[in-house]
C-alpha cells in the first residue's frame, strides 16, 4: 500500500526508516508500559501522583471504535492520577470543531490519496488547511518546502525523513493505530478493483451466474 514509495522492491517502509534513521521510530523496548517510570517523570514535572495536573479533555466522534479507544486513554491516564474527560460529538459537529482547532486533545485520521510520505507529513506544515492542531515549526516547514522543490529523489526523501524526525521529537501527533480494511467478496463477483488507498472500483464489475 502507500508508505513504501521509497522502498526497494520487496522491502517495506519500516526497513527504509531503519536504514535512514538508524532504527525504528517505535522501539518496543523503549515504549513498553512502565507506570512507575511515568509517575516518576510526572513528579519531576511538578505533579506527584497527578496532583495539580489540570483536567484534560479528549474529543472524538461517535463512530466505530473511537469511543473504546477514548475510554482506554482515559483509563491509562487515570493510572497516573490524571483526569481525562471524554467529549463525544456527532460527525457533523466534530469535523468543523476539529478544523477550527477548538479542542485540547482530539482524535484524527488520514487516508493517503497519493503514494508519497509528503501526503501525510504536509498535513503538519504551518500553512496546511488540514493542520487542525495548529502545529508550527519553521524548520519542519523549511524541510517540507525543500522536499517539495527538489527534483532529486534521494534528496526528496532525505528531507522528508528529517522533517519526520522533528515532528516525532515535538510530539506534534501521537500515532495510535494503522487501520486495516477487512472485506468479504462473493467469488461470482468479477472485475472489481481495490486500490492500495482503500478505494473500491465497480465500473467493470460483473456477476457470474
Residue ranges and their predicted role:
Residues 1-4, 26-32, 83-94, 119-187, ...:
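Extracytoplasmic/peripheral linker and loop segments enriched in polar/acidic and small residues
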Residues 8-15, 92-149, 195-196, 201-203:
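Acidic-aromatic pocket-rim loops
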Residues 183-209:
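Long beta-strand-rich cores associated with HINT superfamily self-processing modules
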Amino acid at each position: 500500500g502507500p508508505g513504501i514509495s521509497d522502498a526497494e522492491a520487496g522491502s517495506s517502509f519500516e526497513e527504509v526508516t531503519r536504514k535512514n534513521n538508524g532504527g525504528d521510530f517505535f522501539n518496543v523496548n523503549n515504549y513498553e508500559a512502565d507506570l512507575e517510570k511515568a509517575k516518576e517523570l510526572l513528579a519531576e514535572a511538578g505533579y506527584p501522583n497527578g496532583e495539580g495536573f489540570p483536567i484534560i479533555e479528549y474529543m472524538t466522534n461517535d463512530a466505530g471504535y473511537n469511543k473504546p479507544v477514548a475510554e482506554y486513554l482515559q483509563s491509562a491516564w487515570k493510572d497516573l492520577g490524571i483526569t481525562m474527560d471524554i467529549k463525544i460529538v456527532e460527525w457533523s459537529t466534530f469535523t468543523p470543531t476539529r478544523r477550527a482547532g477548538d479542542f485540547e486533545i482530539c482524535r484524527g485520521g488520514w487516508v493517503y490519496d497519493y503514494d508519497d510520505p509528503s501526503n501525510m507529513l504536509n498535513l503538519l506544515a504551518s500553512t496546511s488547511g488540514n493542520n487542525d492542531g495548529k502545529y508550527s515549526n519553521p524548520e519542519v516547514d523549511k524541510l517540507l518546502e525543500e522536499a517539495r522543490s527538489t527534483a532529486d529523489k534521494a534528496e526528496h526523501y532525505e528531507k522528508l525523513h528529517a522533517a519526520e524526525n522533528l515532528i516525532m521529537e515535538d510530539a506534534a501527533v501521537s500515532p495510535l493505530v494503522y487501520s486495516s480494511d477487512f472485506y468479504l467478496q462473493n467469488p461470482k463477483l468479477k472485475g472489481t478493483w481495490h486500490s492500495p488507498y482503500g478505494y473500491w472500483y465497480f465500473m467493470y464489475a460483473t456477476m457470474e451466474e
